[in-house]
Amino acid sequence: MNINVTLIGQMGTFLVFWWFVNKVIWPMFANIATERQRKIADGLNMADKAKFAVQEAEHQSQEILSKAKMQAAEIVSRANKEASEMIAQAKEQAQRSSEAEVLQAHVQIEQEKRQVRDELRAQLSHLVIAGAEKVLGREVNDRDHERLLHELTEKF
């Protein structure tokens, strides 16, 4: 056998093999590789979109959290203000109540002073009349009694 014929036979076999691989097997692998590239690209795009969505969600959650903090601070502020107003109203009401009680006590004291004064005047006038009866040695009639009482009350 001649090496040229063998070489030509091997070249022919190689060409048939090359043609078969190019027409049948290579397109399958090319399709598989292309499909994988497409899936990988889609996965990367989805990962980028998911990353952006996560960043957006974090941003929104921060905004919501800051709004919630502001609302909570506002609610606490309003509650403190209402509590202060309630305390002020309670103090004012207590002040008015105590002033009214003090005024009522003053009025009651004045009434008691007048009553005691009137009782003392009556007792004093009876003592004076009794003393005058002893000094005069006679009983004082109603007209004299009224006149003496009137004079004594004017002096007091």
Swiss-Prot record:
Family the UniProt entry places it in: Belongs to the ATPase B chain family.
Native organism: Dichelobacter nodosus (strain VCS1703A)
Subunit (UniProt): F-type ATPases have 2 components, F(1) - the catalytic core - and F(0) - the membrane proton channel. F(1) has five subunits: alpha(3), beta(3), gamma(1), delta(1), epsilon(1). F(0) has three main subunits: a(1), b(2) and c(10-14). The alpha and beta chains form an alternating ring which encloses part of the gamma chain. F(1) is attached to F(0) by a central stalk formed by the gamma and epsilon chains, while a peripheral stalk is formed by the delta and b chains.
HAMAP family registered for this protein in UniProt: ATP_synth_b_bprime
Lineage: Bacteria, Pseudomonadati, Pseudomonadota, Gammaproteobacteria, Cardiobacteriales
A molecular function (GO) term: proton-transporting ATPase activity, rotational mechanism
Record-linked InterPro entries: ATP_synth_B-like_membr_sf (IPR028987), ATP_synth_b/b'su_bac/chlpt (IPR002146), ATP_synth_F0_bsu_bac (IPR005864), ATP_synthase_B_chain (IPR050059)
UniProt name for this protein: ATP synthase subunit b
One GO term describing the cellular component: proton-transporting ATP synthase complex
Lipid bilayer topology: Single-pass membrane protein
CDD domains, sorted: ATP-synt_Fo_b (cd06503)
Keyword list, A-Z: ATP synthesis, Cell inner membrane, Cell membrane, CF(0), Hydrogen ion transport, Ion transport, Membrane, Transmembrane, Transmembrane helix, Transport
Function statement: F(1)F(0) ATP synthase produces ATP from ADP in the presence of a proton or sodium gradient. F-type ATPases consist of two structural domains, F(1) containing the extramembraneous catalytic core and F(0) containing the membrane proton channel, linked together by a central stalk and a peripheral stalk. During catalysis, ATP synthesis in the catalytic domain of F(1) is coupled via a rotary mechanism of the central stalk subunits to proton translocation. Component of the F(0) channel, it forms part of the peripheral stalk, linking F(1) to F(0).
Cellular localization per UniProt: Cell inner membrane
Main location: membrane
Residue intervals passing through the bilayer: 7-29
